[in-house]
From Swiss-Prot:
Its main location: secreted. It comes from Ranoidea gracilenta (Dainty green tree frog). Expressed by the skin dorsal glands. This is Caerin-1.19. The lineage of its organism: Eukaryota, Metazoa, Chordata, Craniata, Vertebrata. One of its GO terms (cellular component) is extracellular region. Caerin-1.19 shows significant activity against Gram-positive organisms, but is less effective against Gram-negative organisms. The keyword Nucleotide-binding does not apply. The modification Leucine amide is found at residue 25.
Amino acid sequence: GLFKVLGSVAKHLLPHVAPIIAEKL
């Protein structure tokens, strides 16, 4: 249900968010 949707959304966002986090570290 909801957790499955959140999981798929997180998988789509992770590739975009990871480089931003990497730049800040």
